[in-house]
């Protein structure tokens, strides 16, 4: 049955990788694989429990003074195997939901209108770097999908030329993905590592700073040659928000400070309380929500308030991303609980000598070019457990301990690989749908540049680890 569950996951990966051909939504595929996998796991629960959780199951029977029956096994799986994976997935989903709602509140109140003012230029190069820099900085604080769609919406309203929109949109995509990979709150992969204790926020960002900058700056600089000297723009009136009077500048600045500043405080909140980061995100959301209602109390009872809406493409993208993350975590969870990953590592000799970290990273990067980078990352993260401080194996191989090299390399490589064809991320799919781009055009004009930047960033990561002896996190 382990082989059947693994086959379902592999077929799901094939459908996810060929979404642009089959037109089957990857979120639906991930959810189907996760639910069917757990149903099969429960149906053959006795085999899995005795092979993977025998000690825990014996303790469960002893404490409950119960006999081992099929019902008892199912109850044990439900409470002790299934629910922990639901909790891990819920931590990521609730964090994403909170941060995306924060973005919606800020955007509806015009807190990002300053970006449109920065884009008032006819210089194509200035437009390119303004879009790229603003996107990179925003994606450091917010998730990359939300940042990508928000910036694409702004850019789409300003630039009428489809070809120029494709180039600028690609620059936005690269900046959002590279910026999101720089922090633990910038994309789901970083959140998974942070929640599992594989990395800490400060060390993770310091380690990937130079590689992410290289992966972003090099292809963006190469894209300058694709643009004319001047860019055609169309300027429209600032968006109507339900009332002729908008929030004052200081009110928008305060809301922006509460939202973005609160997100930056979440790592500190986590370090102090040891509670899950999603609780900190919900706390920030609640404070921002209260401030929003205080500032907009005069509009709350007006029919015009209904006009404050988020673009439909953002709403759809948010729902798709949340469901996809939930489905993939459940699918990978059932495969891990079946023992398939342990068998694979034993087959590769993982019980004695772990495979090379850099080969793992390169393999993850190659897979993420066609397979979703989150799905790829989840599989490679699940191959190894985080080595604790008291574990003797940490001295022999610290690459898999907290802030170990393995987690950094895989996180970086899946980001870099996802930029090559554009289909490796949900953000890339959003860009292709909005601008009707083809994968072939993307690779010929953007993908190979992203590959050059990604390889350069990986070389920088290798050099920094080699020169620092892999001990950079001990000095921070």
Show where each model-derived region lies.
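Hydrophobic mid-bilayer segments of alpha-helices in multi-pass membrane transport proteins
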Residues: 3-13, 23-71, 89-101, 252-262, ...
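Cytoplasmic-side transmembrane-helix entry/capping segments in multi-pass membrane proteins
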Residues: 26-35, 117-130, 164-174, 317-319, ...
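Hydrophobic alpha-helical transmembrane segments
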Residues: 6, 28-32, 93, 128-133, ...
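Juxtamembrane and boundary regions of transmembrane helices in multi-pass small-molecule transporters
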Residues: 4-6, 162-166, 170, 182-183, ...
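Structural signature of hydrophobic alpha-helical transmembrane segments
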Residues: 1-8, 87-98, 140-148, 208-216, ...
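Interfacial loop-to-helix junctions that mark the boundaries of transmembrane helices
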Residues: 1, 21-26, 53-56, 74-92, ...
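Membrane-interfacial helix-loop connectors
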Residues: 37-48, 85-87, 138-175, 179, ...
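Transmembrane helical segments that form the transport core of multi-pass membrane transport proteins
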Residues: 56-67, 87, 104, 109, ...
């Amino acid at each position: 049955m382990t082989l059947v569950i693994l086959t379902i996951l592999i077929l799901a990966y094939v459908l996810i990788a060929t979404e642009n051909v089959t037109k089957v939504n990857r979120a639906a595929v991930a959810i189907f694989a996760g639910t069917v996998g757990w149903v099969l796991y429960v149906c053959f629960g006795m085999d899995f429990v005795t092979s993977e959780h025998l000690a825990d199951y014996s303790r469960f029977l002893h404490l409950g003074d119960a006999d081992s029956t099929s019902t008892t096994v199912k109850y044990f799986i439900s409470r002790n195997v299934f629910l922990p994976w639901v909790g891990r997935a819920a931590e990521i989903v609730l964090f994403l939901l909170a941060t995306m709602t924060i973005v919606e509140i800020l955007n509806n109140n015009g807190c990002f209108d300053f970006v449109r003012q920065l884009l008032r230029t006819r210089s194509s190069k200035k437009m390119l770097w303004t879009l790229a820099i603003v996107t990179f900085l925003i994606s450091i604080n917010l998730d990359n999908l939300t940042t990508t769609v928000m910036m694409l919406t702004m850019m789409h309203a300003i630039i009428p030329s489809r070809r120029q929109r494709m180039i600028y949109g690609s620059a936005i995509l690269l900046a959002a993905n590279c910026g999101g990979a720089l922090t633990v709150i910038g994309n789901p992969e970083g959140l998974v590592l942070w929640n599992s204790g594989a990395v800490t926020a400060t060390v993770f960002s310091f380690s990937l700073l130079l590689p992410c900058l290289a992966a972003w700056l090099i292809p963006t600089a190469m894209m300058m040659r694709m643009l004319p000297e001047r860019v055609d723009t169309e300027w429209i009136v600032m968006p109507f928000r339900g009332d002729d009077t908008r929030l004052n500048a200081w009110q928008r600045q305060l809301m922006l400070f509460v939202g973005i500043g609160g997100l930056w405080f979440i790592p500190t909140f986590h370090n102090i309380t040891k509670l899950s980061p999603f609780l900190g995100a919900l706390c920030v959301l609640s404070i921002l929500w209260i401030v929003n209602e205080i500032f907009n109390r005069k509009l709350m009872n007006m029919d015009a308030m209904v006009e404050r809406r988020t673009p439909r493409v953002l709403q759809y993208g948010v729902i798709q991303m949340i469901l996809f993350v939930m489905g993939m975590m459940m699918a990978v969870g059932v495969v891990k609980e079946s023992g398939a990953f342990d068998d694979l590592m034993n087959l590769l000799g993982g019980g004695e000598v772990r495979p090379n970290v850099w080969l793992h990273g390169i393999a993850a990067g190659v897979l993420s070019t066609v397979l979703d980078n989150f799905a790829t990352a989840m599989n490679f993260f699940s191959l190894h457990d985080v080595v604790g401080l008291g574990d003797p194996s940490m001295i022999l191989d610290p690459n898999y301990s907290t802030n170990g090299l393995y987690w950094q390399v895989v996180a970086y490589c899946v980001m870099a690989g996802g930029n090559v064809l554009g289909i490796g991320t949900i953000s890339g799919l959003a860009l292709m749908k909005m601008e009707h781009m083809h994968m072939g055009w993307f690779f010929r004009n953007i993908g190979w540049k992203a590959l050059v930047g990604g390889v350069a960033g990986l070389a920088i990561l290798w050099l920094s680890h080699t020169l620092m002896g892999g001990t950079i996190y001990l000095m921070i």
